[in-house]
Amino acid sequence: MTLIVSWSLNLLSNFVQAASEEPGKSSVGRKVTGFRLNDTAAGQRSFGELAGRSATVIVFLSTECPMSNNYLDPLAELAGKYEGQGVKLVLINPNRDEGQTQVAKHAQEFQIKFPMLIDLEQTVADLLGAKTTPEAFLIDADGVVRYRGRIDDQYISRLKRRESVTRHDLGVAIDELLAGKPITVAETEALGCPIARPVVPKHAKDSNAVTFNRDVMKILQDRCQNCHRPGQAAPFSLLNYRQAIKWALDIERVVTDRAMPPWKPIAGFGHFRDEQRLAESEIATITRWVASGMPEGDPNDLPPPREFSKDGWQLGQPDLVLTMTEEFEIYATGRDIIRQFVIPIGFDEDKWVTAVEFRAGNARVAHHAIFFTDSTGQARKLDAEDPLPGFSRIGFLPSGAIGGWAVGTQPQPLPDGTGMRLPKNSDLVVQMHYHPSGKPERDRSAIGVHFAKSPVQKQVAGLPVFGFRFQWPEGDDRIKTTGWFRVPVDVHAISVFPHMHMLGKEFKMTATLPDGTVIPLINIEDWDFNWQQAYFYKDPIPLPKGTIIDLESYADNSSRNPANPNNPPRLVTFGEQSTNEMCIGFIGCTADNNADFFDLLRLRRPRAQAGASIKREP
């Protein structure tokens, strides 16, 4: 099979029997013939030259979309599978802002060895009604579209993958076509990045109209630009008007659905610092702006550009920078990677930590990280036993934890007068979660540590509240897990860190004070393993001795859960791997009386909690 990567620099078209389709409208059953493309490697090419003897597959791709990039290797494999069977593959880039320089650089980075063209006028995209990258179209020998949609079902939603592909939709359609059979599933929804059509913005008709410069840019600066700027994790930037109108319709959809910015706790159930949840007024502003034609407005209304730290440290230069001891290679495509890396700290005295900041060595693949400490040397042994940098499973009981990071989160200093103890002669163990980007990558991330500059009056402890369940039966779509813990001394809660794995669906924690008052701690109703982080309360919450902290969660181990790592579902047991399951809520807290701190540490252990759970009633 000949692989023709047709990413058009200039597209000259002459359509004989095909009128343009409305984006998203089905083109299945329509005949497509007679267009010509400019191929920068071989000159002008006609559809007849590009078409396969038995069938032609057209796939729309983008250099910026990570989901599109992740299909480059599978598409090359598809090409090899059908070589010699009269099927040809044409890949088209329909994105107006991805010019020759960007495409050439992308081809070099991803080691694409084929001619590349760009559909600047989006003529072919309009012809087929394509709306997403990646999106595939299967055209038979007579020029009739027989299938359109996704390549396979590896993505549940944008950037959220299954553990394994369960249906190769495009491959199945090709097999059925070549066998002379009807296409069983002729159309599926393609998940990916939208193909941005040209927008003709309107001028504001009156002084009260919502404009980009006066109203929208400030929202993007405050809520989006941490990630949506060059060198960060987001697939595109939102730094100016041109970039914003390109993605405006998609921005409106994701903010209305509250898919972005990512913020999991539901409103009103706990009050947190630096909430990334958009206010209803902000959503309304974006919606009104799009509805009114996306006017730019008066240039004098544009706020000054947001300034970001040039050295990458948002809290300023750290007192200590701990860098992974060696680079780790991330494969191009496949399952996400969970990996632990040991970094020696090298202090012969305890240190008080007031803030920890993570700097991704490769923002394209780093998704989240958790920072443990180990004073036993067990992590070093696991690292030594694994031939690759780091090791693949926890396999040890951490001595403590000093924070974590996820895409889009900001470093959070501890309240004044508090600190986390970094034990002497210990190691930092960084648990990294990597997303493959579509090409081989390397990462060597760093953690910046800030030490206390004044005496620490209160030591922060992580209080784990365990959900006591050790088996998650297959087929059950609502598995309830509960746990509770009686606070042994007077404390103040400063943060909460929920933790479950792939089967998790809901997670809630409350605190019931001795007088019966119930305080909401956190409630997440759409758990996502890929978006877990610590949440810091706006104000420390007093929890008197005898307070009961309750945990309640639900998991789905049925085939209806697209995040289920097992197909078909199987019995899942408690364990450290993401394919195992667990349920823990970590409460960051300080003891009101320093003399009680070691009692808090002693009684927070799982065995102590298990014993206490037998005697819940006072």
Where in this protein do the model-derived segments appear?
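Bacterial N-terminal signal peptides
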Residues: 1-14
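Thiol/selenol-based redox catalytic cores and closely related redox-interacting motifs
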Residues: 119-196
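A short beta-strand-turn-helix
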Residues: 35-56, 205-214
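Short active-site neighborhood of thiol/selenol oxidoreductases, capturing the structured segment around
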Residues: 48-69, 174
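Aromatic- and Gly/Pro-enriched helix-to-coil junctions and flexible linker segments
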Residues: 187-347, 425-431, 436-438
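Structural microenvironment flanking redox-active thiols in thiol-disulfide oxidoreductases
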Residues: 69-110, 117-127
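N-proximal helix/coil linker or "cap" segments that precede and/or mark the start of modular domains
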Residues: 12-34, 48-51, 184-186, 190-203
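Beta-strand-centric surfaces of beta-sandwich/beta-rich domains
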Residues: 265-272, 302-352, 357-492, 498-617
